Amino acid sequence: MASRPDGDVWNIVDNDKDSQHYGRNFKFDFSYISSEEIKDVGKDYVWQNYRVGNKVLKRLYDEIQNHFKWFSMFADTNSIHSLRKLNNINIDGFVSFLHTTIAPKRKRPLAYTSQKVALDTLKSVIRWCQIHRPNDVPATEIFTGNEYIGVNRKLKIDFIPDDVVAQINEALKKEENPYLKYGIIILQSTGMRIGDLLKLRIDCIKPHLISGYTIEWTQHKGRKDKAPMPVRSECVAAIEKLIEVTAELRSEADEKDKDTLMIWRVPQGRGTGSVSVISPQTFSQNWFRDFIKYNNIKDANGDYYNLTSHQFRRTLGTDMLSKGTNINVIQQVLGHSDPSVTKRFYADVKDKE
């Protein structure tokens, strides 16, 4: 498809074989944007970034379908029909709008992170236009850069406390869901992202040239293959168990999923009975929530621990730094694009412990 699609509704299939959403159809619906001028900018932003590969399709979908809608609502309320005349007063108004908006589904104020990502999406669209459509955006700077920096800023380091790790490990001994049990062991051992875990291949383990084994996987966020990394025997055993558990399902899986480790037979809901890759929501929301409550895993305040998949990644990095591991080695293990990214997340860990 060489030219921009017509109409307000686009169906674009992710044909990037390195994408964790390969084969998924993304339905873009721009009809919620009232202003034809702003709508045209939004369409161009999506199409041009997709066409040249600047952003993955899922990222563009989230930006336009989930995050940009808040600005569209603000624009409608304030009779804003163009990005060209936006100024800092409008941006302050948008921030106030985000502070006071009630999310329709949750019936609660927007979370701080949701507010920030809504503003970041607007920034991203305007920054792109400054290069590619300069006549459609303000010529002067309208963002101060500190709209969402302050007392409400979320602490970046979010590792799992040692006492909670101990509770998790004890609960894993009797966990009957093999995907959850062995998946957590893999996350603990490698620090990989949840999307990479769910797209792990059955041939990811290779013998090390000297001793033991290494693991390889595709880092979908950075769109590159991870360099072979030495891995503990527990992780190797976990992967072998999952290969064994899923062996009989492979003949029923789609061709693109036959060599994916985390396939299962969908027990209920859409696709019941079919064999497919486990979704991030099933693994890191539904299963984590049930795992924590069933095993009564609580934090220091006596509340159920709010476990996320990314915390295993942060915990691995924190443990390595606390043991004196060089920041560049941690960067390589976690697959950060640059050591500065690793330093930003982990430089002050010891002071916070």
Indicate residue ranges for each PLM-predicted region.
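Extended accessory and catalytic-adjacent subdomains in large enzymes
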Residues: 142-353
